[in-house]
Amino acid sequence: MAELEHLGGKRAESARARRAEQLRRWRGSLTEQEPAERQGAGRQLQTRRGSPRVRFEDGAVFLAACSSGDTDEVKKLLARGADINTVNVDGLTALHQACIDENLDMVKFLVENRANVNQQDNEGWTPLHAAASCGYLNIAEYFISHGASVGIVNSEGEVPSDLAEEPAMKDLLLEQVKKQGVDLEQSRKEEEQQMLQDARQWLNSGRIEDVRQARSGATALHVAAAKGYSEVLRLLIQAGYELNVQDHDGWTPLHAAAHWGVKEACSILAEALCDMDIRNKLGQTPFDVADEGLVEHLEMLQKKQDVLRSEKETRNKLIESDLNSKFQSGLFKNKEKMLYEEEIPKSQDTEEENKESSSSSSEEEEGEDEVSESETEKEADKKPEATVNHSNSEIKSRIMEQIPAPAQNTFSASSARRLSSLFNKAEEPKDESPSSWRLGLRKTGSHNMLSEVANSREALRDRGSSIYRSSSSPRISALLDDKDKERENKSYFSMLVPRRLSSTSDIEEKENRESAVNLVRSGSHTRQLWRDEAKGSETPQTIAPSTYTSTYLKRTPYKSQADSTAEKTADSVSSSTPLCVITNRPAPSTANGVPAATVFSSAGTDPSVEAREKRRSYLTPVRDEEAESLRKARSRQARQTRRSTQGVTLTDLQEAEKTFSRSRAERQAQEQPGEKLEDPGGLEGSTKKQEPSAAPTKGAGEGRSLEEEPIYHRLRYPTQPDKPTTPVSPSASRPSLYTGSHLLRTSRASGPDSENSETSTHATAAKEMDTSEKGEADLDDQSSNRLSVRERRRAKDRRRGTGINFWTNDEDETDVSEEVKEALHERLSRLESGGTNPTSSDSYSDRASARARREAREARLASLTSRVEEDSNRDYKKLYESALTENQKLKTKLQEAQLELADIKAKLEKMAQQKQEKTSDRSSVLEVEKRERRALERKMSEMEEEMKVLTELKSDNQRLKDENGALIRVISKLSK
C-alpha cells in the first residue's frame, strides 16, 4: 500500500509540472499579450455574426447520400438536378461504390434511375469489373441482365473474366462472352489498332491532330509508351511528335514507360534521343519513378544515348564543313557541269516530243557515228552558256526565268528534271573515274519497252538526232569536247590491248576508258542495239566478227616470222582488232582456207570499223557459266594430251598405220635405185603434194588459238633420224596421209614395169612381209593398249557432263571392231598380193613358211576380234550398279560396326563408372563404419566410466543408509 501511495504521488507531481509548463508557454504567447478589451470585442463580433458554415458540392452530397443508403435523400437530389453518373477524384460513380459495398438494393435503385452500367473509372474499370473482382455473383448477373458489356477492357488490358477468381464467376462471364459473340483478343487490341490507324493517318498527312486528355493532359505518345504500343510509338516519332512532351504533372513519355516497366518503349525513346534527365513537377527524373528492375537498363540506355548523340554531332559537323567548303569553292566550276541553253527550231518540236516520250525508259544510248558526235560538240560550243551563281536560290530562279513558254520549249521534260536534280545534289568530285559514275547509272531495261524504244531510236536516226539519253544520264557534251583526254585514252588503249586482252576485268577497264560516253544497259537491250547496227551498217565485212555471245577468250599471240612485214602486220592487227568471240561455226577465213592473219589485217585497216568499236556500248562483262565449263573441258583435254599414260585412240592408230606404210614405201624406193632413176618424179610428186598440205596446217596452227579447236589429238610418229616428230591436227594431217598411201600404191603399181630382177623383187617382198609382221605386232599391242585404256576411260564417259559435250571415237565399239577387222584384212591382202608375184621364182619352203605365218596372223586376228567382242559385249552399267550395291552393303556394314563400337564404348564407360562408384561407395562405407566404430568405442569407454561411478554411488548410498539407520536408532533411544 505504501508503494501505491508513493506511485500516486509521483504522477500528481508530474501532472502539476506539465501544467506549470503549459502556463509558462501561455504567458509567453502572443494571445496572452493582447489587451483584454480587444479580446472581448473579438468574441462579441464572432457571436454577432454566428458560427461559420461549411458547404459541400452537390456531387459530393449525392455520393455521400448513395453511400449511406438514404434513397429519399437521393431522390430529392435527383429531383434538384444532380447527375446520377457523377464521379469522385478516382472516377468512381455511385454505382461503382454501391457494387463495392455489396448494396444490391442501391444498385437496383441506381440502375432503375438510368445509371450507366458501362461507366469506366480512371483505371478503365466498369461496375462489372468491380463485381467480378469482388466475387459478387448476384450483382454480376443483375448487371449482365441489364446490358453490361463483358468485353470492355481496363487500362491494363483486362476484361471482367480476367479479374474473376471464383470458378462460378469465371464460368458465368465466359458463357456470356460466347453468347454475345465477343472476340476478347480483338477487344484487347482495339485501342492499339485505333491508335495505329490514327498514327498512320498523321504520318501520311504530315499534320498531327492529337487532343490531350482533359483530366491528366496525357498525349498519344504517353499512352503508347505506358502501354507498350511499340509500332504506334515508332510511327509517332517518325511523324515528328515531340519526344519530351509533358502532361499536367510534368511526366514525359519516358516517365510513363519507366514507371510501368515497358523496356522496349524506353529503348525506342532513348534511341530517338529523348531527354532522360528531364524532371516532373515534383523534381523526379525517369530514374526516380522507374520500376526497380528497369533502372540498370535505363543507365545502359543513357550511356548508349551519349554515344549516339556524339556520333550525330560529329556527322553534322562534317556535313556542315563539307557544305561550307563546297559553297566557298563554288558550284559547278568545271565545264562538265555547265548548263547549256538549247536552241531548237519550232520545226523540231515533234522530235522533242519523241525524246520526252522515250526519256522515261531505262536505256542510255549514244550517237551512231563520230560525225553526229562532232556536230553535237560544235553546236554545244556555239550555244550560250547559262551563268551559274553559288546560291541555290539564285540558280533556281535563273533557270525558271530562262525556261520559255510551253509552245517554244527548248528543254525536254527529262532535261528539266535533270537540272533540278543537279541542284539538289552535292557537287561530284572532278577526277572521278568513268567506271564509278557509270556504275551509279546502271539500270535494268524494261523488256516490254524494247520494241517501242527501238522504233523511237530508228525514228531519231532518220531525222538526224545526235544523242539519245535517259532521264537519269548526265550531260556528256563536255566530255566529248575534251579532245586531249580522248587522245590519251585512245593511245593508252592501243598500247593496252595487245598485252591485256585476257581477263574480264581488263575488258571492263577497256570499255570504261575507251567509251566514256557509253552508259550501262541490260543484256536484252544490248543485243537489240547490235541487231539495229547490223541492219543499218553499210560495211557487211565488219558484221562477221561480231556475235551475240558474251564469252570472251584470250587470243594467242602470233608466232615469230622471218618476214618483218608480217611482224608489222601482226602488231597492227593486235592493236586494232576487237575481242575474239567464240562461235559454234568456224570463222569465214578458216572455212575458206585463208590464213587468219589476212582477215584480221583487212578488218583492222578499216577506220570506220575501229570507230564503231570504240563507240559501241557493250554489256558489262559477266562471268559466263558456259565459258567456264568450256574452259575447264579444254584444259582437261590439254592435260590429257600432255600425259604420258594417255590412251591411243582409233584415229591415232590409223594415222600411225598410214605413216608407217608411207615410211616403208620410202625405204622400198631407196632400195630400188633403178626404179628411182626411171621414175624420179614419184617421191618428188609426193613431197610436193605433202608440202602444200603442211603449209595450210602451219598457217592454221598459227592463226587459230589452241582453245578454238574442239578436240585435240597429239600424234606420236615413229622416231626417224632424218625427220623430226611434229604434232599434226587431224584435219590437217589427213590429206598428207592420203597422199602417202597413194604414193605407196603408185610405187607398187610401178613395180611390175621395172627392170629389176626377180630376186630383188622377192627380197623386197620378204622384207615387206617381215616389216608387216612387226607392224602387226605393234598393231596388236596398240589395239590391246587402246582397249585397256578404253576400259579405264569408260567411267569418265559415264559421268555427268558439266560443260560442252565432246564426241569421241570411243562411243561406238562395234564400228571400232569392224574398222580394225577391215584394216587388218586389207593389210593381209596387200601383203599376199605383194608376196605372191607370178613372175617370181620362190621356193616351196618359202610358200609354206608364208602360209604358216598367215595362219598365225589369222589366229591372232581371231583372238583379237574375240577380245574386242567381249569388250563390246561387256555391260558397264550393270558392273557400275553392282559396284554401287556392293559399296552400299559395305557402307551399311561399316555403319553397323560403328554402332556396335559405340554401344560397346558406352557399356565400357558405364561399367567403369559403376566400378568407380562402387569403389567410392565402398570407401565411403568404410569411412562410415570407422566413424561408427570410433563412436561406439567412445560410448563404451564412457559407459565404463559411468559404471565405475555407479558402483561408487551404490557404495556411498549403502553407507548413507547404514548411517541413517544408526541415526534413527539413536534418536529413538534419546526420545525414550
Curated annotation (Swiss-Prot):
Residues 1-24, 375-385, 480-489, 622-631, 655-679, 765-777, 818-830, 844-860 have a biased composition (Basic and acidic residues). One of its GO terms (biological process) is signal transduction. Residues 1-52, 342-489, 503-873 are annotated as: Disordered. Gene3D superfamilies: 6.10.140.390, 6.10.250.1820, Ankyrin repeat-containing domain. InterPro entries: Ankyrin_rpt, Ankyrin_rpt-contain_sf, MYPT1/MYPT2/Mbs85, PP1_Regulatory_Subunit, PRKG1_interact. One of its GO terms (molecular function) is phosphatase regulator activity. The modification Phosphoserine is found at S29, S502, S833, S941. It holds the Pfam family PRKG1_interact. Residues 538-564, 722-739, 747-763 have a biased composition (Polar residues). Residues 632-642, 791-801 have a biased composition (Basic residues). GO terms for cellular component: A band; stress fiber; Z disc. Residues 362-374 have a biased composition (Acidic residues). Transmembrane segments: none annotated. ANK repeats lie at residues 57-86, 90-119, 123-152, 216-245, 249-278. Keywords: ANK repeat, Cytoplasm, Cytoskeleton, Phosphoprotein, Repeat. Residues 411-423, 465-477 have a biased composition (Low complexity). The modification Phosphothreonine is found at T444, T645, T802. PP1 comprises a catalytic subunit, PPP1CA, PPP1CB or PPP1CC, and one or several targeting or regulatory subunits. PPP1R12B mediates binding to myosin. Isoform 3 and isoform 4 bind PPP1R12A, but not isoform 1 of PPP1R12B itself. Binds IL16. This is Protein phosphatase 1 regulatory subunit 12B. It comes from Mus musculus. The gene is Ppp1r12b.
